[in-house]
A protein has these predicted regions:
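Short coil/turn motif common to extracellular beta-sandwich-like domains
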Residues: 38-43, 173-175, 353, 363-367
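Pro/Thr/Ser/Gly-rich low-complexity, intrinsically disordered linker/stalk tracts
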Residues: 20-52, 127-132
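Edge strands and adjacent loops of beta-rich recognition modules
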Residues: 154-159, 320-360
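Predominantly extracellular/luminal regions of secreted and cell-surface proteins
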Residues: 126-136, 307-335
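Accessory beta-strand-rich segments of carbohydrate-active enzymes
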Residues: 46, 85-86, 90-92, 103-108, ...
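Short, solvent-exposed loop/edge segments of extracellular or virion-exposed proteins
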Residues: 26-33, 140-151
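Bacterial N-terminal signal peptides
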Residues: 6-16
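Recognizes extended acidic, P/S/T-rich segments that occur
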Residues: 55-104, 114-120, 136-144
Length: 373
């Protein structure tokens, strides 16, 4: 009896030890479930979680599948690493089948340690972006000149560009993905809903070398009739004090847009809604000027109404133009975007003539939100 009790105690002890070790925080290129990466052999990482001390990994096993269902069945149809004797848990290079552009991949891992093996981790995933120039159907569009009301003197002014396109979806949608490069900054809307939670996108670069694009899954937003809307700001692409003396600040051209919306249907067919000269454009919106140095001028009398939704009357808008191609290489943004992290109230508000000065109490970058009665 004592032997039986001891045997069961050992089993329970081994079971508790087994459950006490796991792997968490699965990352691809050090990003958590990234969308639209343009790396053909991404690097995978995880962290060991354990109640025990001195746990050392001795081997790993990675599965990558084309669907969550296959991964749940333990089938790595894209890559099955097998058991690899290694203590590496960071920057493990993918060694499976050639990855396709604009495709989702699902993965999980398990490890052996000096104190037991783990169960399979929770599912993680990444999606690929567009690897080559040939993968982009979208043209660079915009308005490659100043509009009425713009000024390109020492104190430059350039109104935001507003672009829109309506399209229909007639079949059942399996997946819909947007790849967008909006220089210098953009906000993207589909059927009236703003896409993504990052701001001041994309991240700034040396535009002579690199232009970044972002990727979003918009499957749940598509209807039978749809509208895409994009606001283009200047960012650091069209530099607002480019003729500010005694220093010359580089500028890289007028705001411009390139976009692919790839719709994959349940019957296996695909369709791409891409930027071209069929898109409509106006500069007669409420954002009359915008730049990092001098802020934003917003004229609410020029608000455009429901321009990001279907059925909008854009007959007075111009056709978008094909514009000059940026010199930088188009690449996926492989870092987290900037986000709103805090909302602050002013510590004081002072009136100076017909202006109001808000003291936020600290140095910051952001926007003002207010109501007018």
């Amino acid at each position: 009896n004592k032997r039986i009790v001891s045997f069961f105690f050992l089993l329970l002890f081994a079971g508790s030890l087994y459950a006490a070790i796991g792997i968490i925080d699965l990352r691809t290129e050090q990003l958590k479930n990234p969308a639209g990466i343009d790396v053909r052999q991404p690097r995978l990482s995880w962290r060991i979680e354990s109640d025990e001390q001195n746990v050392i990994q001795t081997a790993y096993h990675i599965l990558v599948a084309s669907s969550p269902e296959l991964l749940e069945q333990g089938k790595g149809d894209i890559w099955d690493s097998g058991k690899i004797e290694s203590d590496a848990s960071q920057w493990i290079t993918y060694q499976g089948k050639t990855l396709k552009c604009n495709a989702p991949y699902y993965w999980k891992a398990k490890i052996d340690t000096n104190k037991g093996a783990t169960n399979w981790s929770a599912l993680a995933f990444w999606t690929t972006g567009l690897f080559n120039e040939a993968d982009w159907q979208g043209q660079w569009i915009g308005l490659d000149r100043a509009a009425p009301g713009d000024s390109e003197t020492q104190w430059s002014r350039l109104a935001a560009r507003y672009l829109r396109k309506e399209f229909a979806v007639k079949k059942s949608v399996k997946r819909a993905t947007v790849h967008i490069a909006g220089m210098g900054l953009y906000e993207l809307f589909i059927n009236g809903q703003r896409i993504g939670n990052q701001v001041l996108a994309p991240a700034p670069t040396d535009y002579r070398k690199t232009i970044l694009y972002n990727t979003y899954d918009v499957t749940s937003l598509l209807q039978t009739e749809n509208a895409i809307g994009v606001t283009l700001g200047n960012g650091r692409f069209y530099t607002m004090r480019q003729n500010y003396k005694p220093y010359k600040i580089p500028t890289f051209g007028y705001p411009k847009l390139r976009l692919n919306l790839i719709v994959e249907y349940a019957d296996g067919s695909k369709e791409t809604i891409a930027t071209n000269t069929s898109w409509k454009l106006t500069t007669e919106g409420p954002i009359r000027s915008n730049n990092e140095y001098d802020g934003e001028e917003y004229d609410a009398r020029k608000e455009l109404g429901a321009w990001t939704q279907t059925g909008y009357d854009d007959k007075d808008w111009m056709q978008a133009q094909r514009v000059s191609i940026p010199s930088g290489t188009l690449r996926a943004q492989m870092m987290p975007g900037m986000k709103v992290t805090e909302t602050l109230k002013p510590v004081s508000i002072k009136k100076l003539g017909n202006k109001y000065i808000l003291d936020i109490g600290q140095n910051m970058a952001g926007w003002v939100r207010f109501r007018i009665k």
